[in-house]
Amino acid sequence: MCTGGCARCLGGTLIPLAFFGFLANILLFFPGGKVIDDNDHLSQEIWFFGGILGSGVLMIFPALVFLGLKNNDCCGCCGNEGCGKRFAMFTSTIFAVVGFLGAGYSFIISAISINKGPKCLMANSTWGYPFHDGDYLNDEALWNKCREPLNVVPWNLTLFSILLVVGGIQMVLCAIQVVNGLLGTLCGDCQCCGCCGGDGPV
């Protein structure tokens, strides 16, 4: 597969992942699947918008750039004949780095939240974080420390785990495009062989 085709494949994969990340973050605003009375009772990490910004919005732009690479002709891109395929591939590398950073942001936020656990109503009738250093992950009996919202522990754990996996996959895909983009910049796209009056990659 040539560098342009590879980039298009990566872009097509990133789009649904961005959607899942965006959706997972939205659902976190409804702990246990219910509307909460006070936004202060939501876990702090939810407000960092890891899935909405990191795995969502910041991932759409690289994905669209990757998808458009295969449509760029070998002699130019975006209507500019002086802009060749190599420059387009180099640009995709920059967007891939942006995507990697966005996915990394979502990944880190998710990992921190999973380790910290959700904010909930505790036995002393105050809202806080009853878990420490991920202790609840290996002991489901500790989940009873959270009285409200109902089922907030499995809810947050599931959604942040989804964000963690999505962010990890996105980081890998963006890293692949960095390498792919550099190869396309240095070596050209194999589909450009013989075009524009040339005999080799452009």
From Swiss-Prot:
The gene is TM4SF4. Glycans are attached at N124, N156. This is Transmembrane 4 L6 family member 4. InterPro entries: L6_membrane. Residues 31-45, 115-158 are extracellular. It is a multi-pass membrane protein. One of its GO terms (cellular component) is membrane. The chain crosses the membrane at residues 10-30, 46-66, 94-114, 159-179. Keywords: Glycoprotein, Membrane, Transmembrane, Transmembrane helix. Belongs to the L6 tetraspanin family. N-glycosylated. Glycosylation is required for the growth inhibitory effect. One of its GO terms (biological process) is tissue regeneration. It is found in: Membrane. Pfam families: L6_membrane. The keyword Transcription regulation does not apply. Jejunum and liver. Regulates the adhesive and proliferative status of intestinal epithelial cells. Can mediate density-dependent cell proliferation. It comes from Homo sapiens. Residues 1-9, 67-93, 180-202 are cytoplasmic.
